[in-house]
Amino acid sequence: MLRYRQVVGLLQRRNFSAGATSNGSGSSGGDKSGEDLHPIRRTLRLLGNDMRKVKEFFVPKEPETEKVPIPTQSQFHFSGERDKSKEATVPDDFQTHCDVLIIGGGGVGSSIAYWLKEKARDGLNVVVVEKDDTYAQSATRVSVGGLCQQFSLPENIQMSLFAADFLRSARKHFGEEVPLQFTPHGHLMLAGEEHAESLKRSSQLQNELGARNELLTADRLTARFPWLNTKGIALGCLGLEKEGWFNPLALLSNFRRSASGYGAHFISGQVVDFEFKSQTDISVVTDLGSNEGAYTGLEKAVIQLPDGTRRTCKFALCVISAGASSEQIARLARIGVGPGILRVPLPINARKRYMYAINSQAQSAPGMNMPMTIDPSGIFIRRDGLGGNYICVQDSTEEYNSAMIDPQYFAQHIRPHLYNRIPVLGEAQVVDSWAGCYDHNVYDENGILGAHPYYNNLYLATGFSGHGVQQSLAVGRAISELIMDGQFRTIDLSRLSFDRLIVDQPMFELNNVLS
């Protein structure tokens, strides 16, 4: 607690966050006319305020801004509109100052807000800016909600293990939470001869770190899953516990609801620029010893509101967690276009993901024992309830430019693989389809997380390349640890920092697991 107070005090003393208040006005309120100055009454009033703050510390307030109906697993669209009269983006409530500004309010950004406010409560003024508060373009909307530990990197395995523990005790964390609809079930990752050895090594590492899965030969796969064609398959890895799928939009809603209850401010708007401040007392020196002049830091974000007006928000710390838009935000901060270290860009682009709901009433169609099946072709498929419905997903290599569905995509790219791997679903009927984007790290397809090496007040949490939803829980906690403690306290994610781009040490994930 002492360290926490020191951190908060440091934030509040910094010149670029001086005057930050919970309402963004910077004023202390002054003496109220007619205020009762009787010492006993004043003492009782202060005691009542303290007791109310103690209660709010342990139980978040129920915000009125998160009354959005949450879809079922087979309904991946918001089934209602927000009451715009209750939005927290009324100009009078705009935060002109804050301690932490989070750019991007999807799964990762809202998780960061939740963890910061869960720890700091009123000690930190946290503002989240989201340009699309309907999440029509969010990667969370086109997430299959998978939870799986079948990765090849220890960091990814540990983050998913934490997510499993958190989801199993979600009510303890979220209180009266929106049901996450978590369905415990294993994932089945299939591999041909060329990747069988890698799958073995990954499985061994996963079990050493606390996951539980087993390796199945082609014969054992056929015996266990008669609907599965094992031609071209040498080995399969089946998760035995701590795996399954959940409703990603429900998780996002809980993050927002709880963070708002703890006092976080969610702003509907788009960051269109930054304002900088030159600090003459700090010089930038290159590795070769040349002086590049005074350090120029980030001071304010220029935010365009839905009505077209532009406002500025002065921050002590800023986090870029804008998913597929992160590279554009980084360029506004001169990352990728500046001198020295700033020449190194944030290697994120928007990739398109296709999702299909299909139905088969065939007697031999997969039933309750069907795991989330991951085919070497890149097709992911799982059942959706018990009525013969299935969710089928594939990440395309095309860059995202719109949510339009290519009418020939399923027939050309997905149905042939279904015929091959699960023949009974080859004739399944497509009952719904949708497309969206996700943030793809073109450097090594892994998240970029941590402090930027140039700016002393900028953090990154982006580029998770398709598995950001299941990692959002651990990522939010990790960023909160860096901000409040100055280091990772639980899972050491330092290898995922931006520094690996500068020294050219990629962190390749061999098992791309969707979430």
UniProtKB/Swiss-Prot annotation:
Q: Where is this region: Disordered?
A: 18-37
- Cite the entry's keywords alphabetically: Membrane, Mitochondrion, Mitochondrion inner membrane, Oxidoreductase, Transmembrane, Transmembrane helix
Tell me the lineage of the source organism. Answer: Eukaryota, Metazoa, Ecdysozoa, Arthropoda, Hexapoda
Where, subcellularly, is it found?
Answer: Mitochondrion inner membrane
One term of GO molecular function:
oxidoreductase activity
> Which Gene3D superfamilies does this entry report, sorted A to Z?
D-Amino Acid Oxidase, subunit A, domain 2, FAD/NAD(P)-binding domain
Q: Which organism is it from?
A: Drosophila melanogaster
Specify the protein name: FAD-dependent oxidoreductase domain-containing protein 1 homolog
> Pfam families of this UniProt entry?
DAO
Residue intervals passing through the bilayer: 100-116
Give membrane topology per the record.
Single-pass membrane protein
Q: Which GO terms describe its cellular component?
A: cytoplasm; mitochondrial inner membrane; mitochondrion
Annotated PANTHER family: LETHAL (2) 37BB (PTHR13847:SF282), SARCOSINE DEHYDROGENASE-RELATED (PTHR13847)
Q: Which InterPro entries match?
A: FAD-dep_OxRdtase, FAD/NAD-bd_sf
Q: Which GO terms describe its biological process?
A: mitochondrial respiratory chain complex I assembly
Which coenzymes or cofactors are required? FAD
How this chain assembles, per its entry, is: Associates with mitochondrial complex I assembly intermediates during its biogenesis.
Relate the protein's function as given in its record.
Answer: Involved in the assembly of the mitochondrial membrane respiratory chain NADH dehydrogenase (Complex I).
